[in-house]
A protein has these predicted regions:
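Short, hinge-like loop/turn segments at secondary-structure boundaries
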Residues: 113-114
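...with weaker cross-activation on analogous glycine-rich loops/strands in unrelated enzymes
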Residues: 39-103, 109-110, 124-126
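A glycine-biased structural micro-motif
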Residues: 2-7, 11-13
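Surface-exposed patches in mature extracellular/periplasmic domains of secreted proteins
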Residues: 12, 36-41
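Short, low-complexity, intrinsically disordered N-terminal peptides in bacterial proteins
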Residues: 1-3, 125-126
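Active-site nucleophilic cysteine motif
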Residues: 13-32
Length: 126
């Protein structure tokens, strides 16, 4: 996944040269042999993203937050009252995600910027 670090953010980005948060999650899971459904929702539409995350939760299995599996989807609140951001837990307390003005980066799940924004960890239930 080192090759993904620093790739720019693009709304609707599905790779290989740019990603949005869901496009990156899809790429990481693909590398682990799991296909995720594609959602074509603008990153500017936080309420619609939140609604889609809620609607799709029955398809996902919630994991233990103390020791989440690798990979697992990290669902977060990001500047909103809706869950509107995703990343992928990659082990050792780290997750990879894509953000506007930052691009693809790896952060710690227990970092001050993220630990209170994580709603949960999930793996595909299909």
């Amino acid at each position: 996944m080192v090759d993904l670090i620093g790739k720019p953010f693009a709304d609707g980005g599905r790779g290989p040269d740019s990603f949005d948060c869901w496009g990156l999650a899809s790429e990481v899971f693909r590398r682990f042999g799991k296909e995720l459904p594609d959602y074509q929702i603008s990153c500017e539409d936080a309420s619609r993203i939140g609604a889609e995350i809620e609607a799709s939760k029955p398809q996902w299995v919630r994991c233990d937050a103390v020791n989440p599996p690798v990979p697992s989807l990290v669902v977060m609140y990001y500047g909103s009252t809706f869950c509107n951001h995703t990343g992928v837990y990659i082990g050792n307390g780290r997750f990879i995600h894509a953000r506007e003005n930052v691009g693809v980066s790896i952060d710690r799940i227990d970092g001050l910027a993220w630990k209170r924004k994580i709603e949960g960890y999930y793996v595909p239930g299909w």
